[in-house]
A protein has these predicted regions:
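Positively charged, phosphate-engaging catalytic surfaces used for nucleic-acid and nucleotide handling
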Residues: 1-159
Length: 159
């Protein structure tokens, strides 16, 4: 399972967890997400990250991250989910505070390990979606170059 898929699964799990505990509206979910992100990214919101990375409004910021930055976010979200579940945290403010605490602690861990802070990591020149599309086109073109590879193995006909 690649990092993008892991993050997608963890996003859904965390979304469902906090939804059951009091984060219900899209605006509440946005505030919740930003509470952790702002601690992990030294005050930057998701919109700030998108602006810094120069990506469009409708684009997924996570599609514009290399694996180290994705791993930082996966770890934060997985640990937030675990803490919220383990401590049975409920209510919007308590959930936001818990997510912020985990984001802050992940950032402190990166610092202790002399790691690169997420906001200082490079941004790929192309999103994962663009790379996947290019790979799909390459495969399609490659198949056209070798049509015999598309034919099923059948024994030659005998007269």
């Amino acid at each position: 399972m690649d990092e993008q898929h892991k993050l997608s699964v963890i996003h859904k799990l965390l979304h469902d967890t906090v939804h059951l505990r009091g984060i219900r509206t899209p605006r509440q979910h946005a505030r919740f997400k930003n509470s952790g992100v702002q601690e992990l990214y030294d005050g930057e919101t998701r919109d700030d990250i998108a602006e810094r990375k120069e990506i469009g409004e409708d684009e997924d910021i996570y599609a514009w991250m290399y694996s180290e930055e994705l791993a930082d976010n996966i770890f934060m979200e997985a640990q937030s989910n675990a803490l919220i579940t383990r401590m049975d945290i409920r209510g919007e403010q308590a959930l936001n505070d818990a997510h912020a605490q985990v984001g802050r602690e992940v950032r402190q861990t990166i610092a202790r390990l002399n790691g690169t802070m997420p906001e200082d990591l490079p941004t790929p020149k192309k999103s994962i979606h663009q790379l996947e599309e290019e790979e799909k086109r390459r495969r399609t073109k490659g198949m056209d170059l070798f049509p015999e590879l598309d034919e099923p193995d059948t024994p030659p006909e005998t007269p």
